[in-house]
Amino acid sequence: MTSSLQRPWRVPWLPWTILLVSTAAASQNQERLCAFKDPYQQDLGIGESRISHENGTILCSKGSTCYGLWEKSKGDINLVKQGCWSHIGDPQECHYEECVVTTTPPSIQNGTYRFCCCSTDLCNVNFTENFPPPDTTPLSPPHSFNRDETIIIALASVSVLAVLIVALCFGYRMLTGDRKQGLHSMNMMEAAASEPSLDLDNLKLLELIGRGRYGAVYKGSLDERPVAVKVFSFANRQNFINEKNIYRVPLMEHDNIARFIVGDERVTADGRMEYLLVMEYYPNGSLCKYLSLHTSDWVSSCRLAHSVTRGLAYLHTELPRGDHYKPAISHRDLNSRNVLVKNDGTCVISDFGLSMRLTGNRLVRPGEEDNAAISEVGTIRYMAPEVLEGAVNLRDCESALKQVDMYALGLIYWEIFMRCTDLFPGESVPEYQMAFQTEVGNHPTFEDMQVLVSREKQRPKFPEAWKENSLAVRSLKETIEDCWDQDAEARLTAQCAEERMAELMMIWERNKSVSPTVNPMSTAMQNERNLSHNRRVPKIGPYPDYSSSSYIEDSIHHTDSIVKNISSEHSMSSTPLTIGEKNRNSINYERQQAQARIPSPETSVTSLSTNTTTTNTTGLTPSTGMTTISEMPYPDETNLHTTNVAQSIGPTPVCLQLTEEDLETNKLDPKEVDKNLKESSDENLMEHSLKQFSGPDPLSSTSSSLLYPLIKLAVEATGQQDFTQTANGQACLIPDVLPTQIYPLPKQQNLPKRPTSLPLNTKNSTKEPRLKFGSKHKSNLKQVETGVAKMNTINAAEPHVVTVTMNGVAGRNHSVNSHAATTQYANGTVLSGQTTNIVTHRAQEMLQNQFIGEDTRLNINSSPDEHEPLLRREQQAGHDEGVLDRLVDRRERPLEGGRTNSNNNNSNPCSEQDVLAQGVPSTAADPGPSKPRRAQRPNSLDLSATNVLDGSSIQIGESTQDGKSGSGEKIKKRVKTPYSLKRWRPSTWVISTESLDCEVNNNGSNRAVHSKSSTAVYLAEGGTATTMVSKDIGMNCL
């Protein structure tokens, strides 16, 4: 192909030159004549004779060809060089007769040079271009072509890669789903292969036993054995397929899941298609039917509930085991109709038509889309609040659906235990009702349940009988409430509920041997008092298993006999007033009849370990009495009991009746105590306690509670006392039984207690020792508040030994009185000093043992009265100002000589005197002015007088203006519980004080002082008391 530039370029002088050359060539056949031009005039070894400069030719050697080189730029063609071409190469390149450019111009100078060669004479004069024309874009056409191609290839590659990635992702997801589904399908195939090959032609439908939303249930016979057959219509084919596949899941065999036999389809006689599920037959039917026909005791009810929970927990568990895999399954239609009862009293779960297999957050239902509506449930009555609200947590479908099942399980618990006979003692068990049947009836609508459950947050109500405050009932109610909690995430898991149901059975079995967990309704108040607090009150004392906070804390625990008030259903009761008629006011009548004997250690211990001081005893009627149980000495201290006063033991009453009036008295709510201790200030607490615990006059004739401390002191010292009852019949007496022969009670600690009512009275007698309570072990004259029968009257006129310690204080360079130890009765009888020393030595050792234990250590940070009840009696107002001023004066004025005495008796030991009960008269000091002071709140009371008047006894209730007050105790500990000291008024207690020693000051003048711990207690109503003195140092004893 020739381009437009193929027009020959002619030189004007060429015609005649060609003619001349052709003539010469003819003569020289062997040589080639070519046009020659070399602007650079290079010497190529060619002779000048061979070049013709005139015509510009050259005679080439043999075998050479002619060539020409031109430059083409900007439309012009310039000759660059011509001559002979002698390079050896392809001979076909220069075989043309004309000089033709056939090759693409080289890239030198942007392709502007043209080169050609030829094999004839003067053929290189002109040239002809014979190569494909360049692109229309003259600027680097090859590069543009390569760039476009690269872009196209890149785009194509990216597109293919993207498609490949998408295909891989899709394939991976499909493979992942297919792998689980394939494993499931494989298991389904294995399960299908494991199904028995039964001929359904032998299946006979005998009777209709139930009809549901998705089909009917028949009792049938397959190969002569009873079976249950569920028949699905064609419209419910999907439910049949789903339930069949759930039953075929590997590892679905469980004791609490209904046993599946076979599933098949068949055509009826009228040409309809129906689907059959053959299952094991359970004669008792559904749980709903069973509960409507039967009641059960506690253990049977727990067995029903536990078996249902166990089956549900297995359903909710994902279980990979070898080549088999069981996914977690949500039932989604759990109710009492879908639970069947076996012959052994356990349950199985059935009806899995709406169940779903749960795999993480994915739902798997064969034959349906994965995004099946999870709000679909079987029964509206059992719908959880979040389902009614449409607020199911879709981000965690597995947990959400399990929580829906747990809500329904809580309703089933309620239905089961509403038919428990043990939870309705003394009354008929209510008829069976489904959950919310009282509120919405038998056919509730979705809107009804939405308003009731979701909006109003109501649940089935617990009956009044379930308010019994026992551990088993409380645990049951907590479990049910935790299952149907409004917050789905706060509900129990099935595994946790299973453990709780197992514990409920254990609690019942463990407690029924000690005391019935659920008692008759007449003892509800007593059980609430005993059982609701025995867990929160810490065990104290050297025998924690036998002690409780209600045990009376006394400073002496090792006496021969101790009078205790017992308030428990295990306490001894007296003989009934009327034999022919059952005493309705007595608690546990049969138990009282069986236990009206000598108390056993088990009953004695139980009566002490189940008490709490939460009742107000000011309102007791005269018919109540005191129960007396003697306490044996401990083995390591029996050698100390050598006094002959313990040998004379009379009949001891051991059983009295406990009436409902005792239980109907006001009790302190423990929650109020905690609230008072934590929230209110001291002043507010005092005001609250006055309002809450005010009661009748404790000093009235009908109140005998204040006689208890004196009787206790006398009994501890003598071990002998006769009691009589004035209004409630004769007490059960056991003649000729020594207190040491009766089972001992546990030793109690002498923990600091706050004072209760302690009215003091004057006694117009002459010189008698003063009474002062030891500051170390505080005031132990306490009011008994265990809420049971108490002693009304004390008519004994026999002498009683009272231990008295005289801690005299002497100044420097002064002698003390003699150390003769005597025991003198009020009527003049005096015991020997040897006996007194024995009792005194034993009492001192007992007091030391009370304060050496780690648990009994007294400190400010751990006050033991935090769990004690608040004051209940409103004490009389009268002389409290004088007593409080006296306490403040004694606290603020130190003893002369630089010695002080604190509550804990940490002061330096001082010399001690033993004096006679008659006392020694001393000089009276001038009374000092009284200063009004703010009422203090002592934890330990120092009730000793601060002055004496000329040998006569001083009343404690007198004002400090009668004499100069002496140094006294410092109150170091702050009482945490509120109380207030009110007026001290005269009562049957007579406590006299008198100066027994003299203390010399630095100036050498004598001043009347009092004994540090001298006491003398007398009975004002005809009885006598005995004062004992001891010379042991540091001993304070009552």
UniProtKB/Swiss-Prot annotation:
Instruction: Give residue numbers for the modification (Phosphoserine).
Output: 586, 680-681
Please describe, based on the UniProt annotation, the reported consequence of changing residue 123 to R: In PPH1; loss of function in BMP signaling pathway; does not localize to the cell surface
Q: Which residues lie on this side of the membrane: Cytoplasmic?
A: 172-1038
Q: Which UniProt keywords apply?
A: ATP-binding, Cell membrane, Disease variant, Disulfide bond, Glycoprotein, Kinase, Magnesium, Manganese, Membrane, Metal-binding, Nucleotide-binding, Phosphoprotein, Receptor, Serine/threonine-protein kinase, Signal, Transferase, Transmembrane, Transmembrane helix
Which Gene Ontology molecular-function terms are recorded? activin receptor activity, type II; ATP binding; BMP binding; BMP receptor activity; cadherin binding; growth factor binding; metal ion binding; protein tyrosine kinase binding
Q: Which residues carry this modification: Phosphothreonine?
A: 379
Bias type Low complexity, positions: 603-626
Residue spans of biased composition, Basic and acidic residues class: 872-896
Q: What is its main location?
A: membrane
Q: What happens upon changing residue 87 to Y? A: In PPH1; uncertain significance; unchanged subcellular localization
Mind telling me which PROSITE patterns this protein's record contains? PROTEIN_KINASE_ATP, PROTEIN_KINASE_DOM
Give the intrachain disulfide bonds: 34-66, 60-84, 94-117, 99-116, 118-123
Localisation per UniProt entry: Cell membrane
Query: Which stretches are transmembrane?
Result: 151-171
State the associated disorder: Pulmonary hypertension, primary, 1: A rare disorder characterized by plexiform lesions of proliferating endothelial cells in pulmonary arterioles. The lesions lead to elevated pulmonary arterial pression, right ventricular failure, and death. The disease can occur from infancy throughout life and it has a mean age at onset of 36 years. Penetrance is reduced. Although familial pulmonary hypertension is rare, cases secondary to known etiologies are more common and include those associated with the appetite-suppressant drugs.
Q: Which family does it belong to?
A: Belongs to the protein kinase superfamily. TKL Ser/Thr protein kinase family. TGFB receptor subfamily.
| Name of the molecule in the record | Bone morphogenetic protein receptor type-2
Record the organism: Homo sapiens (Human)
